[in-house]
Amino acid sequence: METPGASASSLLLPAASRPPRKREAGEAGAATSKQRVLDEEEYIEGLQTVIQRDFFPDVEKLQAQKEYLEAEENGDLERMRQIAIKFGSALGKMSREPPPPYVTPATFETPEVHAGTGVVGNKPRPRGRGLEDGEAGEEEEKEPLPSLDVFLSRYTSEDNASFQEIMEVAKERSRARHAWLYQAEEEFEKRQKDNLELPSAEHQAIESSQASVETWKYKAKNSLMYYPEGVPDEEQLFKKPRQVVHKNTRFLRDPFSQALSRCQLQQAAALNAQHKQGKVGPDGKELIPQESPRVGGFGFVATPSPAPGVNESPMMTWGEVENTPLRVEGSETPYVDRTPGPAFKILEPGRRERLGLKMANEAAAKNRAKKQEALRRVTENLASLTPKGLSPAMSPALQRLVSRTASKYTDRALRASYTPSPARSTHLKTPASGLQTPTSTPAPGSATRTPLTQDPASITDNLLQLPARRKASDFF
């Protein structure tokens, strides 16, 4: 029977054309431990069984519960009965009842093992109790599967074996193509082996032999120019094989179960107190259930509370100020070096620094005085341009000139338009052209009055008072 991949190997390189060579250390170890080739389906099924057993042990139970619920939903009583017989009556219970609380031993006596109490390390009961005789016989005949690492080292699939053989053929072809690279290494190994053997008398008499012994080991693919090859781990051959016990990585029951109520804890405490009766502690004295443990004849005291009572004195008081507080300058406070390390202290400014600050303050004061004086002069000059600021000592001609000059830069009508003014009053002004003789004869008894001229307070006053259109009778 041909092994898997034999046809592929024969196509790549015939067996007769393969150059004989010495196997390397890693290949020799692999050749000694031959793996058993399994069918692809059988290999995957065995691998799945090992992984489910070691890493997912609850899958079988969950799958049975799912089938039981589906049979109950469909009304299949026969299927429900078969599942109940196969997996027992505990299938419907999702969580087991918690075991009785374990009492921690308080003495040095050997703990007693009572009959009927379960131990954590006990093996679970076999689930094949309700199986038929034929099925039980088949399970006994089956060989138990090893661990995952052992299974992978013992068995392999057809695809993996075929791939390994193809890789071996590729290596053989590479060595045949580069035979000159490995020929020197083979010659060196042969020469090294001959040197270790005891030569005959004829060879010892030959004078042309080398005086020195070759100690440098020649290798075609050295570690300098090629990647170093792995060294076979021979240390594990002398040690006991290690394995991972996967069941120890899981809890057999929930350690944080809420089923242990306060009542059960009280029962455990009472049971522990009963066990202490008549027992002797590590100090050689009898244990009293209601008494706290003692060390050297003295019991433990309660931890003092940081918050004192109402009638007790407080731990800290701030004191009272009975007089006017007085500020103490830093220079008057004596400096006490309480710590050996360096301390921070603000020093008083030096004489040079104080003199510089004084000169800077004086220069700033002078600049402020000059600025105020210049501002005052500008204000006086602006005020002298208005008629209100005319001095009575000035001549009338000079006063008229100043008034005429100031009136060029000010518009009274414009100023009155945006400046609120009190109730306007009619001012009487003398006409600039002098007195004029009226054209009409004044009525007897009426005094001659100066014509009234109203000074408009704003340029918008009398804007809508348009002059009336003259008639023809006004020209005759």
Curated annotation (Swiss-Prot):
Name positions with the PTM N-acetylmethionine: 1
Q: Name one GO cellular component term.
A: catalytic step 2 spliceosome
Cross-link Glycyl lysine isopeptide (Lys-Gly) (interchain with G-Cter in SUMO2): which residues?
142
The residue ranges flagged as biased composition, category Low complexity, are 1-18, 437-451
Q: Which InterPro entries match?
A: Nuclear_protein_DGCR14_ESS-2
**Chain intervals with Polar residues compositional bias:** 452-463
UniProt GO BP: mRNA splicing, via spliceosome; nervous system development
Keywords in alphabetical order, please.
Acetylation, Isopeptide bond, mRNA processing, mRNA splicing, Nucleus, Phosphoprotein, Spliceosome, Ubl conjugation
| Compartment(s) of residence | Nucleus
Q: Which residues carry this modification: Phosphoserine?
A: 292, 391, 395
Which parts of the sequence carry Phosphothreonine? 3, 386
Q: What does this protein do?
A: May be involved in pre-mRNA splicing.
Q: Which family does it belong to?
A: Belongs to the ESS2 family.
This protein's assembly is summarised as: Identified in the spliceosome C complex. Interacts with FRA10AC1.
Q: What is this protein called?
A: Splicing factor ESS-2 homolog
In the UniProt record, what gene is named as encoding this protein?
A: ESS2
